[in-house]
């Protein structure tokens, strides 16, 4: 299945990013299947940008909550965020970390985790890996109810997942989870990374290339801009929302960090960087009115 292959490709790209020194992740190489994938400097920096932003969001949410949090990772694939958090701080305040994905990916991930003591030793009652179909909204809610506790601060993350599903489905999924699982009035955050802008020349090529690969951005036309993503979050009841292109997100990275990244690899064509990263957005939304966590 094409979606399973995209998960493995994403994993291999993170591995290359780690080997170049961008990220500290001692676990992701355990999941690598394709050792031939090599990123361009542009792709390495983009991978660093979104990976770091997601991790900083979760860390910031935990700090602001002041109590153990719950994490829901939609379409987690071979992501290692839970293991990175617990590796860096065994007492990281997470009550439950629930990863949801297709059955084949979940089975494979479970097998690899059990095979490596470095990962298996970090798995306890806090970590839950569940197979499910995100189209089955009620089924997802049922699974989450079995593992999560209403009233506990919860952060939902979706990295390049919802764009593969019709917008009406993902909106209903978020609404149902917020209403039936997390409980109204509970501190909730939603963080997403998705492709956007399908209608210009670059966007059309991006969409067509994916179709040739056997997959489809079924939700990209429903939320084609950062503003559309922000509007959805507002309509779902989030009070504080930040939705920006990845190009603009990078502009918030402190200069000293950018200098460090340049020492790892130089980007020669910033026009290409700007074009590509204008076609991806990062969304952070909170039900609270306090400022959002600082991403960088």
Label each residue range with its predicted role:
Residues 133-136, 195-204:
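Short, conserved secondary-structure transition motifs
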Residues 201-296:
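Rossmann-like AdoMet/SAM-dependent catalytic core
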Residues 152-168:
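A short SAM/SAH-binding and catalytic strip from SAM-dependent methyltransferases
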Residues 122, 127, 135-143, 164-184:
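A short, conserved alpha-helix within the catalytic core of class I
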Residues 114, 169, 178-189, 233-234, ...:
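Plant-skewed but cross-kingdom recognition/interaction modules and surfaces
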Residues 154-158, 174-200:
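Conserved beta-strand signature within the Rossmann-like core of class I S-adenosyl-L-methionine
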Residues 128-130, 191, 241-244:
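General small-molecule cofactor/ligand-binding pocket signal
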Residues 1-130, 137-151, 278-281, 288-296:
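Rossmann-like AdoMet
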């Amino acid at each position: 299945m094409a979606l399973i292959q995209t998960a493995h490709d994403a994993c291999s790209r993170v591995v290359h990013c780690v080997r170049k020194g961008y990220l500290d992740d001692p676990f992701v190489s355990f999941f690598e299947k394709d050792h031939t994938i090599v990123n361009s400097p542009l792709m390495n920096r983009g991978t660093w940008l979104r990976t770091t932003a997601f991790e900083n969001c979760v860390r910031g949410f935990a700090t602001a909550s002041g109590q153990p949090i719950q994490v829901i990772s939609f379409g987690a694939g071979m992501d290692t965020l839970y293991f990175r958090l617990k590796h860096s701080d065994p007492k990281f305040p997470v009550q439950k970390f629930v990863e949801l994905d297709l059955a084949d990916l979940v089975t494979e991930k479970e097998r690899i985790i059990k095979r490596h003591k470095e990962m298996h030793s970090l798995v306890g009652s806090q970590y839950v890996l569940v197979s499910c179909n995100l189209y089955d909204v009620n089924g997802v809610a049922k699974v989450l109810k079995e593992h999560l506790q209403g009233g506990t601060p919860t952060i939902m993350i979706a990295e390049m997942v919802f764009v593969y599903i019709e917008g009406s489905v993902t909106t209903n999924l978020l609404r149902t989870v917020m209403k039936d699982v997390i409980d109204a009035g509970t501190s909730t955050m939603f963080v997403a990374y998705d492709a956007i802008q399908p209608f210009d020349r670059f966007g059309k090529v991006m969409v067509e290339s994916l179709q040739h690969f056997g997959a489809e951005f079924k939700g990209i036309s429903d939320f084609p801009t950062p503003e559309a993503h922000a509007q959805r979050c507002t309509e779902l009841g989030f009070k504080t929302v930040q939705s920006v292109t990845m190009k603009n997100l990078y502009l918030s990275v402190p200069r000293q960090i950018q200098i460090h990244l340049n020492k790892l690899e130089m980007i020669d064509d910033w026009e290409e960087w700007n074009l590509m990263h204008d076609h991806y957005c990062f969304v952070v939304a909170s039900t609270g009115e306090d400022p959002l966590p600082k991403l960088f």
